[in-house]
């Protein structure tokens, strides 16, 4: 999800069209666009860049399956006009990152490939560096990587990167150069992945901890779970998610308890809201939000 001017844009993964556009305040549907395909105006597996302020009806996504950045004119797309999407090559070094942030010529991102916690890629110099996994995490063996899956968020104003782990109840804070500043464990007991024979796979009884992380200038927001991974594929009514808020010293601030199970959310700082996606008991996928000022 992202916001652009008075709109909220949501990526649909299940079918065409690829993007749904809502009124940012009342969440009435305004339109949709984007078809699956290999053409310059098509999409296969797009993501929004993290931390971007999209204004003037212009936004960008990167498509990991098409290895391209797509510049989108939102108004042209909604009115089905030509030349609404322009494709630009995505640097091959960063293809496959589920979280991607830009700071000038530098990209920060992560990949679930066991190479490191996150990477720093300077396009101008061509230098690509992996930031090693912290020593408090289990060392990935052979080609296995899922055990150290994580999601990151980057603050350009603070010049810091936060990493939240899928299977560990740990959060790590780094500076722009990849130096570890601080780490915290959230919860009284240590949580880590349950591994199968010869540490070759994460077992379904492993607890999910943090499935998403967002941030603004003041706070870090973690989508927190406490459910076995095997149950997460078929959420039930009693399963609830939480959004845990930390400051940039990784000190605890508060927790928002959601009435649903969700794995994706957006902090709309302009409206002081948290918007999230959840599947209802009827099997529909709906948008929900709550006011952070209440």
Kindly label every feature range from the protein language model.
Residues 8, 59, 106-107, 161, ...:
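Hydrophobic beta-strand positions that form the internal "hydrophobic ladder"
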Residues 65-68, 72-106, 110, 137-138:
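Asp-box/WD-like beta-propeller blade repeats and closely related beta-sheet repeat scaffolds
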């Amino acid at each position: 999800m992202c916001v652009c001017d008075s709109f909220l844009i949501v990526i649909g993964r299940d079918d065409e069209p690829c993007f749904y556009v809502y009124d940012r305040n009342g969440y009435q549907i305004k339109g949709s666009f984007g078809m699956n395909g290999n053409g310059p105006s098509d999409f296969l597996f797009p993501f929004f860049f993290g931390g971007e302020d999209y204004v003037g009806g212009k936004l960008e996504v990167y498509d990991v399956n098409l290895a391209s950045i797509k510049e989108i004119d939102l108004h042209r797309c909604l009115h089905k006009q030509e030349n609404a999407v322009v494709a630009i090559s995505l640097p091959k070094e960063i293809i496959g990152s589920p979280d991607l942030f830009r700071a000038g010529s530098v990209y920060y991102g992560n990949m679930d490939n066991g190479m490191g916690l996150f990477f720093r890629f300077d396009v101008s110099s061509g230098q690509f560096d992996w930031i090693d996994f912290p020593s408090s995490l289990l060392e990935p063996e052979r080609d296995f990587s899922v055990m150290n899956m994580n999601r990151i968020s980057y603050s350009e104003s603070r010049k810091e990167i936060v990493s939240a782990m899928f299977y560990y109840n740990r959060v790590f804070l780094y500076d722009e150069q990849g130096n570890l500043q601080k780490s915290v464990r959230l919860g009284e007991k240590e949580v880590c992945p349950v591994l199968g024979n010869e540490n070759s796979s994460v077992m379904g009884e492993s607890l999910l901890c943090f499935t998403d992380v967002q941030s603004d200038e003041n706070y870090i927001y973690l989508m927190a779970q406490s459910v076995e991974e095997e149950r997460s594929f078929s959420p039930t009514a009693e399963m609830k998610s939480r959004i845990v808020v930390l400051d940039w010293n990784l000190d605890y601030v508060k927790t928002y308890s959601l009435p649903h199970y969700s794995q994706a959310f957006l902090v709309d700082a302009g409206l002081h809201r948290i918007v999230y996606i959840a599947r209802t008991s009827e099997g529909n996928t709906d948008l929900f939000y709550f006011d952070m000022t209440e």
